[in-house]
């Protein structure tokens, strides 16, 4: 529909080419915020049909808007309203006040409270890092599961014997080519999600009392694992562009004996950065010659917003000294709890540890994921969901910028569906979380993501749900609470 209120004066319109009239109309809609940064505009063909013009005319209008810096084309996704980078808040600043030191972890595990909040349907789910079920291929997976169950008959209730069904391990090996690796089925073991994979990796490489280098901030479930395994954490600062501060790590390794190093180099949780390849190589060079087990959490790496999938650490050689952990919980089916690890030289050890703990896995979910990866259209599904997450992250950014006070910092996620937000220093994120919950909103306060309880004025926001009026109102309420706390 053409909004004539945004057109130039009639005298000028008569002298303007049609493509320019259309470009000016859309520019007016962008200026009035009828179309917001991050919004997808109609496809060229759709726009030409709406405005009853030829496709070349519509394309010329879009080219004009691109030249004006108002929209941008994204590969295989279409055209989107562009945000002026100068308008974006700065990225969060996460430098520690003192040099890193190894610390023992105490306190309650934050996961239970966050997951309980997610299960409470009365709360707007901005806390736990879980995607909306409506974006996941639940119906198709259910059909696959039922078909496999009928095919197996009584055998469908059997265990999936360690190291996991070969059909899934073959698919993982095939997909490892996309990760920059060339692994084979025997390199993999199927686990109960990435959580078990990380736990097995730590148990295989560390003894109680050992020190583990971790990113700060990092996945908050890691702190609970370290505590239960009686391991110390050596928090390393991270940079939004480069990942773990490797200069700081190198200095720390001269003073502290470290048994393992856990990193999320691809679409980091909670920040969303990708560690550059040159830094990945240097990280390997710092850890492997010192006998430090390098453990990579690759959970979000399939969820890039654009471009190719980033390479895993195993793509840079020394694959036997690197443990790769991953899961299909964030990408396909959280409730199926299907994860994996490729443990290199520790493969026999992690297999023995699994057999001594969870023993075996669930057969049907494992086979269903394997079938979906092979014949279910996983790549086509990923193209759709990547676009959705990118749009949802951009919509959340826009709403936060509008509702929160000046002086905040916002991450620039390159993949996944999480947003890391630095609030004014006077805001206590833990108190804010309690106030938000009373208002019907779940968020994740920053101290959860630090073994030492840092990031007291940071929050992580889940963008895994399609944008709607309920989420928009919740962000407005949250912004009001931040405004009050910042005074």
Question: Could you say what each language-model-derived stretch is?
Answer:
Residues 1-148, 351, 355-362, 371-373, ...:
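N-terminal basic, amphipathic alpha-helical segments
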Residues 36, 259, 337:
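Short acidic/polar active-site loop segments enriched in Thr and Asp
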Residues 72-73, 183, 443:
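Short beta-strand "wing" residues that participate in macromolecule-binding interfaces
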Residues 145, 150-290, 295, 301-319, ...:
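Conserved core of the PLP fold type I
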Residues 292, 322, 408, 441:
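Short, conserved active-site loop motifs that form the nucleotide-linked donor/cofactor pocket
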Residues 318-387:
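Conserved core segment of the aminotransferase class I/II
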Residues 382-408:
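Conserved PLP-dependent catalytic core of the aminotransferase class-I/II
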